[in-house]
Amino acid sequence: MPSKTKYNLVDDGHDLRIPLHNEDAFQHGISFEAKYVGSLDVPRPNSRVEIVAAMRRIRYEFKAKNIKKKKVSIMVSVDGVKVILKKKKKKKEWTWDESKMLVMQDPIYRIFYVSHDSQDLKIFSYIARDGASNIFRCNVFKSKKKSQAMRIVRTVGQAFEVCHKLSLQHTQQNADGQEDGESERNSDGSGDPGRQLTGAERVSTATAEETDIDAVEVPLPGNDILEFSRGVTDLDAIGKDGGSHIDTTVSPHPQEPMLAASPRMLLPSSSSSKPPGLGTGTPLSTHHQMQLLQQLLQQQQQQTQVAVAQVHLLKDQLAAEAAARLEAQARVHQLLLQNKDMLQHISLLVKQVQELELKLSGQSTMGSQDSLLEITFRSGALPVLCESTTPKPEDLHSPLLGAGLADFAHPVGSPLGRRDCLVKLECFRFLPAEDNQPMAQGEPLLGGLELIKFRESGIASEYESNTDESEERDSWSQEELPRLLNVLQRQELGDSLDDEIAV
């Protein structure tokens, strides 16, 4: 074999248009050696990304569990893919029980997808569907070389193509036998009675009883069965990756209407004639009806689960609303209690105000004077509201307070004798306990009491307004004339609100 140069770098083994093996070799089976990583059940993948993710997840899980890889022998034939555990024979063991060494066996038409990892080209896997439970199972393997993994993937793809051709031949034979007559059609329906069926023909007959999950259903005349189409099985038929590796095998003849890596090719093409016995009551139509009923049942179960979930959600919302309503009622009750306490407090205050008003209105004239005098004594003297000619107060400790009160002469211009003056002064003198004690023993005389016209309801405002005016009064100079502290004439105070009351 000539060596490769830079002008002869083409390797036929990597050319997808050239088949790897002879079609007759698939009748006997083609064997490969690899290491079995593990298998796990996966949901039906919808994209290549999901398949690669499942492949890597299986690798990492088995590696984390410290499960060692097993050496196996992969046999690819028209009967399917068979994985046999590779184990050394003992010297005393003469019999070879293949059932004990068999790891798995999947027919070609049940294989869903075959590919290898883009990051590690030594890792490849295929997804097969279980016929009893319709569960997809991903089987991961590892080969010694990258080229070996590529050859295994392409061999499985070529096995699809060979089985598809054999199924077309078998369908054509059945169509030719149908033209001979009803008697010959019954005998030709299953082939020659004296000839034993080959592995490829057994695969093609199995498709009449069990179709692939992606098979396109043929509408039956006279039966109102819902038609539903499924997704494309070959994920690379939609969009292929531009990597250097090979995901699935491609048919060497592009003009042929087939998908090399898809199980759909096991069914007859649309251009070929329909197989006999496809009317009502055939196993294929019964299988389709059962499949439809199962899917309807699954749909009803899903709808029931959705309804139950909605009921649970409504119950949770109802419980939350009930809890919120109870909390709101508790808050309202607490507010009502607080309002009740406030109303009781307000009623108590109103009662006290009424009692004070009754006391103020029911007091005698002297009682009012005594109370007002007490207020005046505590707050200080109120300012005199008189004409501008009234002299300002002088120091209260002037010697004129004790000596010249009786002999004090009133000037002509003094406002004390006028009746139209705004303020009148009267003398209120607090006598000591013993009359014979002189005035000079330190007992102070009550200062001048200033009388102001006011109403009983305005006592508090007048009392509060005296604070600022008292400061102004204290700022006066002490050298001014002393204020008159005694009133010459004492008049009786009236009970009316407009009368003059001493403050």
UniProtKB/Swiss-Prot annotation:
Main function: Adapter protein involved in neuronal nitric-oxide (NO) synthesis regulation via its association with nNOS/NOS1. The complex formed with NOS1 and synapsins is necessary for specific NO and synapsin functions at a presynaptic level. Mediates an indirect interaction between NOS1 and RASD1 leading to enhance the ability of NOS1 to activate RASD1. Competes with DLG4 for interaction with NOS1, possibly affecting NOS1 activity by regulating the interaction between NOS1 and DLG4. In kidney podocytes, plays a role in podosomes and filopodia formation through CDC42 activation.
Cellular component GO terms held in the UniProt record: anchoring junction; caveola; cytoplasm; cytosol; filopodium; glutamatergic synapse; mitochondrion; nucleus
Interaction with NOS1: annotated span: 491-503
Residues annotated as domain PID: 26-191
Stored SMART domains: PTB (SM00462)
Outcome recorded upon mutating residue 501 to S/A: Does not affect interaction with NOS1
GO molecular function, one term: nitric-oxide synthase binding
Source organism of this protein record: Rattus norvegicus (Rat)
UniProt name for this protein: Carboxyl-terminal PDZ ligand of neuronal nitric oxide synthase protein
Keywords tagged on the record: Cell junction, Cell projection, Coiled coil, Phosphoprotein
Motif (PDZ-binding): 501-503
PROSITE patterns given in the database record: PID
Region (Disordered): 170-212, 266-285
Superkingdom field: Eukaryota
Matching Gene3D superfamilies: Pleckstrin-homology domain (PH domain)/Phosphotyrosine-binding domain (PTB)
Any Pfam family matching the protein: PID
UniProt feature coiled coil, ranges: 319-360
Tissues expressing the protein: Mainly expressed in brain. Highly expressed in accessory olfactory bulb, caudate-putamen, cerebellum, cerebral cortex, dentate gyrus of the hippocampus, islands of Calleja, olfactory bulb and supraoptic nucleus. Expressed in kidney glomeruli podocytes (at protein level).
Any one GO BP annotation for this protein: regulation of heart rate by chemical signal
InterPro entries: Adapter_Engulfment-Domain, PH-like_dom_sf, PTB/PI_dom
Compartment(s): Cell projection, Filopodium; Cell projection, Podosome
Residue(s) carrying Phosphoserine: 183, 187, 190, 262, 368, 371, 398, 414
Subunit structure as annotated in this protein's UniProt entry: Interacts with the PDZ domain of NOS1 or the second PDZ domain of DLG4 through its C-terminus. Interacts with RASD1 and SYN1, SYN2 and SYN3 via its PID domain. Forms a ternary complex with NOS1 and RASD1. Forms a ternary complex with NOS1 and SYN1.
